[in-house]
Amino acid sequence: MAGGNSFLARTGRAFKDFFSPIDLTKGTVWKVILKFTVPIIVSYILQQLYILSDAAICGQNLSADEVAGVNDTSPLVFIFMQFAFGCTAGFCVIMSNKIGAGDKNGMRRSFATQIVLCLAITVLLTAIAMSCISLMLAWVNVTPQNPQVYRAAYTYCFVIYAGIAAQLFFNFATSILRSIGDSFTPLLFLLISTVMNIWLDILFIKGFRWGVAGAAGATVLTQALCTVACFGYIFIKYKDLRPGKADFKIGTRDIAAHLKQGLPLGLQFSVLSIGLIVMLAETVKFDIMPGGAFVAGNPAQNGMGAANKLINFMMCPMSALGTAIVSYNAQNLGAGDTERVKRGTNQSLVIMLFLYVLFAGFGLLLTIGGAYQRIFLSADKISSESLRYGNAFLYVDLPLFIILGTLFVLRNGVQGIGKSIWTLAAGGGELIARVVICAFLPSLINGGAVNATASHAAFVALCFGDPGAWLFAVLILLYPYRKHILKKDYSYLFKK
């Protein structure tokens, strides 16, 4: 009996430890990073399942035009959601610095400042997004000329944009938890949200037959409910974070410090979205005949859309590693341990190599027999042409994932030491490279304007927009990585 009680006690302590924040300033560097990263990896994979459940259920239950419409909204949703995500991730660098320095008053003031800024950003983004839907759809060549695709895309954007608040504050809450070293609780909430979203998708799309609106509504409702639960957990579990009335007496210095970290990262992600919009607009051209009619089934859009979803899934582990290194570097810089910042960033690059081999290889395996398209599209939407377009994209992107992994580590490592202006510069570099490659290289290879009759080589040229953009950004980030992280030059911290 005593042995049984001992086992239960150990199990209880182990379960409790999962919910305890990790001190990123102590312990063996690579072990601490891995321990902190693994729940984030699982969280990001769940987040993709959360997104992919929409795609799979839509792909199996909606028409080809409706699926194409939903796929075409990806960069348009991305441009606002990623701005919000970038801002909240950047704001939390301040929180991590305060935690590393042991400044509890600073933690609460940072939390209060972030709440106010997130409310302001929500109002601004919702107003802009809701008023610009038709304009942005025109950017990606989705117009009333193809009414079924246009109607589906407009409806999806409208519902998602109306729920920006839920998505922004859910990202904010999970970023707060990770900034204090708790990467397990966001995983738990994402698990709950994934299951809930799949159930609501089935209910709204198959049960109520709400179509595209049902898919978007399920996502928004799920995130709203999980946001409330997540903030409730934060206020109950972490009493030191509860801001009081005095903490909301925010000065311009507090706002400026957070905006200095958040805005460049938010703008960087939005800038990336503009590049993706250009890439999508060029992809749509491969579905348009010389006379202006659309190819039946939209194979380029659906093939590329399915491939993009697989790419997003396979990049999750490397993206999660980048997310982890932000909090790791920020906490250790706050504690004044610059050598630990250097070792952590370098060891993260080694970890990234293992993740690259594993997940890029697995992604390539899923191209055999078009397996990935069978996940995201029903059989009637899969054709030799959709496979040709989708596989071409994957054969270019996946082998070059090592560049993307390097970008994730360097960009987030530099963000974690407070040099957010360099992350914005890298985003600008990505935009320039992607726009130049996507807008000019396909036409150059094709020997003229691109349309559904263009050569396969022209589409392959378009696919190089991704790795070309990643490489350009990495080249920019090598400077702050070498100057500040490797050479440990942190003199900028002491400048007034």
Language model segments and positions:
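Small-residue-rich hydrophobic transmembrane alpha-helices
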Residues: 67-127, 167-186, 301-364, 404-426
